[in-house]
């Protein structure tokens, strides 16, 4: 989208009598999207399913699909891998290790295979990478005859953290071979020369916003041919201040030929505004409850809250590890501050536990080593700050322990979301102290919404929810929906 197109799109309402180029482009784009949906051939085995069975599947998995195109034909969810559209390669072979698609995959795959723009709102650990990854690879397979020039990727996936970017890259690599796709992973802390080399032949670029923008600015990558764009964990990227970087990255990408996918755990006004700016007639797929309401925890996670005194936490942590950890089972222990994480890591090492740490003071190589040790079992306890609370997909985390409660209940939900992933049961234990009582009301709401037991000691702190605060304005802050038109105010003479 060029700067001029963007301006035309945002000012279209002010000039209703004359259609701008921007308006025409949006109209053309919608027509193209509708045409693409018609090109999606639904697997015949889906046609034979009774509508009642489809309705039951959507209801039982709390799937809500909202289409901005009123005349669009509803597409049936892909309930089984056997319902996937035909493929000329062995792209689907790796799926044999999975039992069935997750809810977000079932609901979004037909839409994404059909070329629609999609907003996916779902909890972490719900299988989002394959939800957007499989249609991306199918798109590359279908366009094999078109030769791409060096440094011109067909697909770009933007992620908030290097750890998540690496995770997405690794998972896509497993499926990329059969279609001959090359996947590059781009993030800061690595020499640009090495990254320029892999960008030369990459069909798919998985990147963090800052480094991708740097390489874009110095001419190392041309995004003018991107046909598939994914913004993964969009809410997290905006929280980290990447909004302008994202806009700059998207600016040279084609409008009418680009399919845009956005995945997010929450749906605040700032994310809605970004979606309305860059997406064309998107379909919104929501898994679970109202995403604009209070944060909701994964109901498969058993949440236990223990109210303790601050000086009791270290001793209780050791007791919990001895009680719940067996053999090489993985445990994530979250701390609030970097120095606290370092202290807890050393404390557990002195007690004979195999421990690794990950926090902001560590170099990139040190983080990689810690994560690798945890994944391979060389370390069975990972002590982390919130830098690791979102985006990391470490299989089979047995238990999450919150040594110190985070600053917000949203961070609490993201922390405990490291367990109970991909349909598995999870377990999270939180050590809550009087110094955390400002968060007691919000925590009680999360526990109740997930059907968890609320301890009497926690109820004694009260159920009042602390008023949301802005980083700069504190409590004097109103969460305004910027997508709504401003109210016109007329002053008398």
UniProtKB/Swiss-Prot annotation:
Belongs to the DEAD box helicase family. DDX5/DBP2 subfamily. The gene is dbp3. A motif (DEAD box) lies at residues 232-235. Residues 23-34 have a biased composition (Basic and acidic residues). Residues 109-285 form the Helicase ATP-binding domain. InterPro entries: DEAD/DEAH_box_helicase_dom, Helicase_ATP-bd, Helicase_C-like, P-loop_NTPase, RNA-helicase_DEAD-box_CS. It catalyses: ATP + H2O = ADP + phosphate + H(+). ATP binds at residues 122-129. Keywords: ATP-binding, Helicase, Hydrolase, Nucleotide-binding, Nucleus, Ribosome biogenesis, RNA-binding, rRNA processing. One of its GO terms (biological process) is endonucleolytic cleavage in ITS1 upstream of 5.8S rRNA from tricistronic rRNA transcript (SSU-rRNA, 5.8S rRNA, LSU-rRNA). ATP-dependent RNA helicase required for 60S ribosomal subunit synthesis. Involved in efficient pre-rRNA processing, predominantly at site A3, which is necessary for the normal formation of 25S and 5.8S rRNAs. Residues 316-462 form the Helicase C-terminal domain. It comes from Aspergillus terreus (strain NIH 2624 / FGSC A1156). This is ATP-dependent RNA helicase dbp3. Its EC number is 3.6.4.13. One of its GO terms (cellular component) is preribosome, large subunit precursor. The Q motif is unique to and characteristic of the DEAD box family of RNA helicases and controls ATP binding and hydrolysis. GO terms for molecular function: ATP binding; ATP hydrolysis activity; RNA binding; RNA helicase activity. PANTHER family: ATP-DEPENDENT RNA HELICASE DBP3.
